[in-house]
Amino acid sequence: MSFDINWEKLTTDNQINDSIKNFLHEQFQSLQLPSYISNLEVVDFKLGTIPPEITIRHIGDPFEEFYANPDDGDGDGNNDEEVLKDKSTKLKNRQAVNIIPNKAGATHEADIINDHDYGDEDDIDDDYDNDSDDYDDDENDGLHDHGEDEENEESSQYDEDRLSNITEGLSLVELLASASTPKRTSPQRPPLISPRGEVTQQTLSKPKEPFQSILNPYGVTSVLNQGSNAAKNTTATSIAAGTTAANGVGTLKDIFDQNNFSSRVIPKIKTKEESVSGDQQQGKQTGKANEKGQKHKHEHEEEQGSDKQNAKNKASDDVQLILEINYKGNLYIDLLVTLLVNYPSPNFISLPIKLHVTDLVIHTIATIAYLKHAVYVSFLCDVNDEADGFSGASSNASTPNVTGTTSGGGNSGGNIVDYYFSDPNNKERIDIIKKIKIESEIGEVENNILRNVGKVEKFLMEQLRAILRDEIAWPSWICVDMAENDDEEEDDDDDDHDEDNEGRGRMRDTGDVDVRDHDKKED
């Protein structure tokens, strides 16, 4: 199956050529020009007389992205921003919350230190007060820090379900190994890592959490008093090998056989303050979990609603073509630019240059979709040819190959340069343009100005390739709205219809007059 496209009718339409010229001119006007260029403008554009070779590779339904309506309102955008902020906050909490084992076997959960909720070091040290005080004082401290623990608990709840079984196992091995040789000396406070990467070291008189309180959440039923004899004859090596652990904890094999690590959710390591107020916190935690569940449910419903909306927007005549486009034609672009020589003073010499860009080579895979009375065009990827290693091409992304130099009389000069964009080491996803030729027309020139012309040409070619890649390479596309033309045609048809009705009305009136005149004549 083949299609015949009247390329001549397409290229002779001045409206299409002017629209493309205006588009390129606006893009070039938005560029930040270097110091040796000024007054850049596109003066002419023609599609040329040579049509491209187009091969249809696939026919199917349009991409879902084409159905997304950017004019739905600001509500969706605000929701997206809130989701991004929420994910960013969770990522920061994930980086800030760490479980740090100390040498005595106790652990402390690092506080979430943000720029807006932490104060002096003295305030942070309040969590590590001496346990030589009465238990009531510790309880008061726990109530004082109740709000902060609640915030840490909420932020770390999201992180715990992301920990893997390997992390849990390694953390427990470190705890057991450190517990095998307990020290009665004053332990050092584990380092606190601030968001700025600063490490501070503080000392403690005594760890607040016993080793038993850490192991209990993991389902370990052994307690410290059951294995005092085994602790004397056991070392860290025997623990790693799976023998009886210190303090009667049991072997690693026994611990892993309890199926405590089958879930990806690591149990919560409770502090003393949390244990005291655990009953009070349970109801609040349940409420927070329900709120998070409702939030995820709401997001899921929004996604389903978006899919349903896209399904409603689809029509039976929507179609998309995946095409292979191979173009080696005589399309051309005319540009005017002023070349500046900034030595010995800024703008010392200004020389207008006319650049004639032609002979584009494009071999790519593109998609053309028709839906909602609009045509969407986007380039997906390049197609490698056997002749991609053009002669004169090197590892540079844009390699000039001078095919001609001065032309015309002695008072005028110019050069013709072929630029190739074939680079095996190119990291870009798509180039679109593989080859392009530039013909420059300048006035009286010197060799140093000719070298600057080469810089101008290279700059313009790189910018042209960047414009095409950013504007019409996937995930970007251009849209040709056909609904406006249909509305104009309908308006024209309505006007013609009204004029016909008015003409018929006049004809009826004229007919009546003629009849009356005819009757008068008979009388």
Curated annotation (Swiss-Prot):
Residues 1-483 form the SMP-LTD domain. PROSITE patterns: SMP. Residues 108-160, 178-213, 270-313, 483-523 are annotated as: Disordered. Residues 178-187, 277-288 have a biased composition (Polar residues). Residues 108-117, 289-313, 502-523 have a biased composition (Basic and acidic residues). Keywords: Endoplasmic reticulum, Lipid transport, Lipid-binding, Membrane, Mitochondrion, Mitochondrion outer membrane, Transport. One of its GO terms (cellular component) is ERMES complex. One of its GO terms (molecular function) is lipid binding. Belongs to the MDM12 family. PANTHER family: MITOCHONDRIAL DISTRIBUTION AND MORPHOLOGY PROTEIN 12. This is Mitochondrial distribution and morphology protein 12. It comes from Lodderomyces elongisporus (strain ATCC 11503 / CBS 2605 / JCM 1781 / NBRC 1676 / NRRL YB-4239) (Yeast).
